[in-house]
């Protein structure tokens, strides 16, 4: 009997789709990049983040570390490619996305955000510490 992907803590495979700046698909599995916020598609910054990410990672091999949470149809975790390293940190460094403080409680992206400067996009209320 196969093990459910939802029970896995690590997922590896090709990136097949970029939904937007903070959601990718590895194979057929949607991953919400944890600790990251990007403006929505349909906004200038959101469209730039999505287009940039598509150019950088489609068909690249990713390793994702899942945290066991779900949001809508997506699993939640941090993903990296050999070319970019941590995708979230890379998008912050490019000033295309920002740190979502509430979901980066261990501060993994804190230094990346400090180096990049203030995020120019909108920080949603759910990113503020509760």
Placement of each model-derived feature along the sequence:
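Small beta-barrel nucleic-acid-binding modules, primarily SNase/OB-fold domains
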Residues: 2-130
């Amino acid at each position: 009997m196969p093990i459910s992907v939802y029970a896995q803590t690590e997922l590896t495979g090709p990136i097949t789709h970029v939904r937007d700046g903070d959601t990718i698909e590895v194979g057929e599995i949607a991953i919400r990049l944890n600790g990251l916020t990007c403006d929505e598609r349909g906004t200038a910054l959101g469209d730039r983040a999505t287009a940039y990410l598509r150019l950088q990672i489609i068909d690249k091999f990713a390793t994702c570390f899942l945290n066991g949470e779900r949001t809508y149809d997506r699993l939640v975790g941090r993903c990296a490619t050999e070319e970019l390293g941590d995708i979230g940190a890379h998008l912050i460094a490019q000033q295309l996305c920002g740190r979502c403080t509430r979901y980066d409680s261990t501060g993994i992206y804190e230094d990346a955000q400090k180096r990049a400067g203030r995020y120019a996009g909108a920080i949603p209320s759910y990113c503020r510490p509760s």
